[in-house]
C-alpha cells in the first residue's frame, strides 16, 4: 500500500515508521525532520526498536492509496488544503478531538475515523521514541462496516501494528473524547503527569469532565454510559501514569492546545457541562493572553 502520513510528528512518525516496514510510506513534516529522515532514515527507539527508510517530504503531491492525518485538530483545515494536491483513495484521521473527519470530508474521498493509543515522543529530528505499546482502532466515522476499513486494517496488521477494525466508531470516538476531556485539560492546567489523576481532587475533576462528555454523547444519540466513560478514563490513567499528556506538553512549550476540539467541543453543546466549560475557559484564556489564538 502507498501511504502518505500528513503531520509526521510523534505519533505520525511512529505509525508511519511501523507501516514502512511493509509498505511504501511518505512522511510529510517539518524541514529538519524531513531532512534527517532523507539522510539517515527514521530511527525508532523505546518499546519498539527499528531503523526504517520511508520517503520524506515537506509537501504533498502525486497519488496514494491512503493518507493518514495526524496533525493537531486546529491544523486540519491546512491538512485539507495540502491533501487536495494528492490523489488519495482514502483518508484516515488519527487525531484528538471531534470535528476532524467532518472537515476532511471536503476532500471528497472516503474518510475513516481512527484512534491510536501507542505512546510516542519525538526526541530529535529523524528519531521517534515509542513510550508505550497500544493499538489502532479504525472504521467508518458513522459506524458500520466497509471494505475499505477492512483493507486498511489488514495493511496495518501486515506491518505488525495491533489493529482493530470497528463497526462502532461513533461510540469509540466519544469514549476517546471523554478520556481526553478528563485527562488533557486537567493535567495541562495543574502541570502534573497522568498518574496524578488516579485519586484526590484532580481525579474528581477528570471524572466529572468525562461524565459530562458521556452525557453530551447521549444527547447526540450515542449510547455511552457514564460508567463506561469513567472506566475508560481510569484505565488510561493507570496505563499511562508516568506520561505527560499532549496538552500538558503543549502548555509547557507555549504552543496552542487542542482545547477547542476537546473540552470546548463538549462545552459548546446544548447540555449543561460546567466542568468542561470551566476547563475550556481557563485554557482559552491562557491561549488568548499568550497570543496563541487562530
Task: For each feature predicted by the language model, list its residue ranges.
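NAD(P)+-binding Rossmann beta1-loop-alpha1 motif at the extreme N-terminus of oxidoreductases
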Residues: 1-53
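Rossmann-like NAD(P)(H) cofactor-binding subdomain of soluble oxidoreductases
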Residues: 31, 45-129
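Internal alpha-helical scaffold of NAD(P)-dependent oxidoreductase catalytic cores
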Residues: 86, 103-107, 126-176, 185-227
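Short, charged/polar "capping" segments at the starts of alpha-helices
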Residues: 33-38, 100-102, 146-147
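General beta-strand structural signal in soluble alpha/beta enzymes
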Residues: 111-114, 163-167, 275
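Hydrophobic anchor at the start of a short beta-strand
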Residues: 3, 24-25, 91, 111, ...
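NAD(P)-dependent Rossmann-like dehydrogenase/reductase catalytic/cofactor-binding core
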Residues: 207-294
Amino acid at each position: 500500500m502507498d501511504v502518505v502520513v500528513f503531520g509526521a510528528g510523534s505519533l505520525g512518525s511512529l505509525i508511519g515508521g511501523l507501516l514502512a516496514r511493509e509498505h511504501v510510506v511518505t512522511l510529510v513534516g517539518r524541514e529538519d525532520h524531513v531532512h534527517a529522515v532523507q539522510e539517515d532514515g527514521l530511527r525508532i527507539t523505546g518499546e519498539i526498536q527499528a531503523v526504517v527508510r520511508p520517503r520524506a517530504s515537506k509537501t504533498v503531491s502525486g497519488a496514494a492509496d491512503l493518507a493518514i492525518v495526524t496533525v493537531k485538530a486546529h491544523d486540519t483545515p491546512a491538512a485539507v488544503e495540502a491533501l487536495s494536491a494528492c490523489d488519495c483513495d482514502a483518508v484516515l484521521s488519527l487525531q484528538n478531538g471531534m470535528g476532524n473527519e467532518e472537515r476532511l470530508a471536503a476532500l471528497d474521498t472516503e474518510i475513516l475515523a481512527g484512534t491510536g493509543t501507542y505512546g510516542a515522543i519525538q526526541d530529535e529530528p529523524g528519531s521517534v521514541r515509542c513510550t508505550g505499546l497500544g493499538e489502532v482502532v479504525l472504521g467508518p466515522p458513522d459506524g458500520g462496516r466497509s471494505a475499505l476499513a477492512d483493507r486498511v486494517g489488514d495493511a496495518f496488521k501486515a506491518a505488525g501494528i495491533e489493529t482493530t477494525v470497528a463497526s462502532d466508531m461513533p461510540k469509540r470516538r466519544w469514549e476517546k473524547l471523554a478520556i481526553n476531556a478528563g485527562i488533557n485539560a486537567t493535567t495541562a492546567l495543574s502541570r502534573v503527569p497522568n498518574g496524578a489523576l488516579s485519586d484526590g481532587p484532580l481525579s474528581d475533576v477528570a471524572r466529572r469532565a468525562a461524565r459530562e462528555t458521556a452525557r453530551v454523547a447521549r444527547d447526540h444519540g450515542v449510547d455511552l454510559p457514564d460508567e463506561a466513560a469513567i472506566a475508560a478514563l481510569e484505565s488510561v490513567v493507570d496505563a499511562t501514569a508516568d506520561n505527560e499528556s499532549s496538552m500538558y506538553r503543549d502548555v509547557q512549550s507555549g504552543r496552542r492546545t487542542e482545547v477547542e476540539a476537546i473540552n470546548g467541543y463538549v462545552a459548546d453543546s446544548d447540555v449543561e457541562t460546567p466542568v468542561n466549560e470551566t476547563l475550556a475557559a481557563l485554557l482559552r484564556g491562557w491561549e488568548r493572553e499568550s497570543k496563541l489564538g487562530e
